[in-house]
Amino acid sequence: RRNSLNARVTCVSVNALEPPASALWDFDIIACNPPYIPTGDIPGLDVSVRDYEPHMALDGGADGLDFYRAVTQKWKSALRLGGTLIFEVGIGQAPSVEDILARNGFEGIQTTADTQGIWRVVEGTVNR
């Protein structure tokens, strides 16, 4: 409300591993904080995370990159020309996610560090 975005922002909750319904096309921005922990790393997580966070919110597949591949491939067409796909990434995953975006035709790929200096956000633009 403070920024008068209510009429201009739509939040949706969908299965990101499936292609979007045609009603969900024409986004300017898709922001995604997918599960990114490699399956084999989950048993070693701190108990406060491992035992209390839903497993589906943590498990990013064998290498932690399953959701990045799926969302990049299946949701690219839902972005407008000039639209941006923004991902939160796990520690050390930024180069792999940059590569996934590049291989899927995204341009202007940028990576941003968090307040601890860890590369945490990767984004790319669709310029078909």
Please state what every model-predicted region is.
Residues 1-127:
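S-adenosylmethionine
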